[in-house]
């Protein structure tokens, strides 16, 4: 008479218990707002760090302030609809962000950028597409003084600015007198 379990019986019972456990395990829903807030928090910390180590001030360049590191929330084309954001330093001072100007995601090394076409691609982070990825239809920034949905720019002194000035800057003091500074 056989008084012990065979290896096959033990494996079968463990597999059955594992299967039943996964069937009745409560399903956890992914909270998109938490995911977005953690991504934005990571990106803002990285952006501020980048601005602190990358001083854009140049006394010979009257448009130096356009090169500040900036996060800008924008609307997709009307045919597409939605909202996206991009993080960039406008190196050519054109006023329009480009993939070359954008900050890289520190985790995936993808550009934190998209154009107003709002298509996902392998070079850019998918987390910038707020409407497509997270279902967000509106963003309100109380300090917005631009034509975009919202914008925050970081100076090398750690200050946050609500807009990039269009004024010519004679000196640093004149710049602070002409621009709104957020504390």
Question: How would you describe each model-predicted region?
Answer:
Residues 19-45, 49, 53-183:
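N-terminal helix-rich module
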Residues 1-21, 25, 29:
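Glycine-centered recognition micro-motifs in short, flexible terminal segments and loops
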